[in-house]
């Protein structure tokens, strides 16, 4: 029997709304780096729907085999095999005009979030766009009871995880040369945060 591909039901539910965001903000882009491709479901869906984009997948080493299963089945010419990417380095020796990451900032440690944003000036071209999807707090408050419960679950699983404060993340983004372009409400109490890389 062929090896079963990894599958996450939330990816199936949110891929449509996220694609609407990407169609707008990645219009005219050429090369996108996905940080934390996870199961690979998002990459296949977005690369298939956006054939003008070269979509580079990445994740930690243990997740690469599952991503390859999705990519090998899809056979999309614009979807690239995953590269190992740990936010603490090394990063790909390449530049991109789009970066996408979904449901990663609340999983990695805050030190990891800082490392991710610190690396962006070398990775994201001037005028490039970062799209980050996931739940966030505002003014220190959760946007829903379900997000508060999810945050508690995250912290029980790993003390370093947790839903991040939008204001703190945006300040971090600004310190890396990014300007907030849009904060879009998404289904299931998530957000799509879009930043643009300022010129030097």
Residue spans for each PLM region:
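Conserved Class I S-adenosyl-L-methionine
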Residues: 143-167
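Class I SAM-dependent methyltransferase Rossmann-like catalytic core
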Residues: 1-29
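Conserved class I S-adenosyl-L-methionine
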Residues: 28-38
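A short acidic, Gly/Pro-enriched loop at the edge of an enzyme's catalytic core
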Residues: 91-99
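Class I SAM-dependent methyltransferase SAM/SAH-binding core
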Residues: 33, 41-89
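Conserved beta-strand signature within the Rossmann-like core of class I S-adenosyl-L-methionine
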Residues: 127-136
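Core SAM-dependent methyltransferase catalytic element
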Residues: 178-200
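A short, conserved alpha-helix within the catalytic core of class I
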Residues: 108-120
